[in-house]
């Protein structure tokens, strides 16, 4: 019996440490099947609803391709294409979608919305991103880390997340570290540290593992001897210019660049980025943002560092597909048989 059957994935703490690592192991197996053109369609006749209140590239494509690979059908419900929370309550929408579909993905503005969907739909609900958590991204990150260091335990791996940690990525990184025992350093100004309650909880949980979690403003302390430096964009579309200005001023000295890599004292240090990255000026939008705030060579990461690490970064992005596929298979099948 598959103990993840009919389970939601709203945040990583929905799983135990063993369950999380089993998902990663399943993702490795599914990835190998796809690479060898030996995909086994386990989700035939399954129907999946994809609710996107926010635009998406990697998340939407990963859910759609994962479903198609496994023989499932999807319905894309984009921004403004449903009555969710406007003409119809979230509860009512959840109840009808739960009757029509075998599972629901939600990517939107409020974590409370996905909690209501999960409570009322009676089918598995998966979090493609909310303001609180981004669990499917961290599943891909853990798979990527495991692929690079297959022989190491997670507690033997040091990862510094540099930048804004007061967001869904910071929260999900904390939860991931507390479950697998990663040695995690959140390197940011205090204003960009995670909420105290989730940090305190995850710090307490990791005591049962061999890893560690710290927050520090000190870049030298935070990145010394790490195996990975991880970063994300500092600004999001839809936020006010005032928010952008304040955050960029806070984070300007936390750019991932060649000097920071030298500070690690690890010539083999790897760089992760969950994308999109403001590393070059090849789009009008990014070009105008970088020019406005005085950046000539990328914002949160320089183009030089991005290009040197692009193989890992794009592998990390591809791993969204394989880990999401593992979540779909795990939650929609009573028994997983290959």
UniProtKB/Swiss-Prot annotation:
This is Ornithine carbamoyltransferase. It comes from the Bacteria. One of its GO terms (cellular component) is cytoplasm. It is an enzyme of class 2 (transferase). Keywords: Arginine metabolism, Cytoplasm, Transferase. It comes from Buchnera aphidicola subsp. Acyrthosiphon pisum (strain Tuc7). It catalyses: carbamoyl phosphate + L-ornithine = L-citrulline + phosphate + H(+). Its EC number is 2.1.3.3. L-ornithine binds at residues 168, 232, 236-237. The keyword Translocase does not apply. One of its GO terms (biological process) is arginine catabolic process to ornithine. Pfam families: OTCace (PF00185), OTCace_N (PF02729). It is found in: Cytoplasm. InterPro entries: Asp/Orn_carbamoyltranf_P-bd, Asp/Orn_carbamoylTrfase, Asp/Orn_carbamoylTrfase_sf, Asp_carbamoyltransf_Asp/Orn-bd, Orn/put_carbamltrans, OTCase_ArgI. One of its GO terms (molecular function) is ornithine carbamoyltransferase activity. Belongs to the aspartate/ornithine carbamoyltransferase superfamily. OTCase family.
């Amino acid at each position: 019996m598959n103990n993840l059957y009919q389970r939601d994935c709203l945040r990583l703490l929905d799983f135990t440490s063993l369950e999380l690592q089993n998902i990663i192991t399943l993702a490795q197996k599914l990835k190998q099947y796809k690479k060898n053109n030996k995909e086994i369609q386990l989700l035939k006749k399954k129907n999946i609803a994809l609710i996107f209140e926010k635009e998406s590239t990697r998340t939407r494509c990963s859910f759609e391709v994962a479903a198609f690979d496994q023989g499932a059908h999807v319905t894309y419900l984009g921004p403004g294409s449903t009555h969710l929370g406007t003409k119809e309550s979230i509860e009512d929408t959840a109840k009808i979608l739960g009757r029509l579909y075998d599972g629901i993905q939600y990517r939107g503005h409020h974590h409370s919305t996905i909690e209501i969907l999960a409570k009322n739909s009676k089918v598995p609900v998966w979090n493609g991103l909310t303001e609180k958590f981004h669990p499917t991204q961290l599943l891909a990150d853990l798979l990527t880390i495991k692929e690079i260091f297959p022989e190491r335990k997670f507690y033997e791996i040091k990862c510094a997340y540099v930048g804004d940690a007061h967001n869904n990525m910071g929260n999900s990184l904390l939860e991931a570290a507390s479950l697998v025992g990663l040695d995690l350093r959140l390197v940011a100004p205090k204003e960009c540290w995670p909420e105290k309650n989730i940090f305190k909880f995850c710090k307490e949980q990791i005591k049962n593992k061999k890893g560690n979690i710290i927050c520090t403003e000190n870049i030298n302390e935070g990145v010394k001897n790490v195996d990975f430096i991880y970063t994300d964009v500092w600004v999001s579309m839809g936020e006010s210019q005032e928010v952008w200005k304040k955050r960029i001023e806070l984070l300007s000295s936390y750019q991932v660049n060649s000097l920071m890599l030298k500070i690690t004292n690890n010539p083999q240090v790897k760089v992760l980025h969950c994308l999109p990255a403001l590393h070059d000026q090849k789009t009008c939008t990014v070009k105008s943002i970088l020019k406005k705030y005085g950046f000539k060579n990328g914002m949160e990461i320089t183009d030089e560092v991005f290009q040197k690490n692009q193989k890992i970064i794009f592998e990390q992005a591809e791993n969204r597909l394989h880990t999401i596929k593992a979540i779909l298979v795990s939650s929609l099948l009573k028994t997983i048989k290959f």
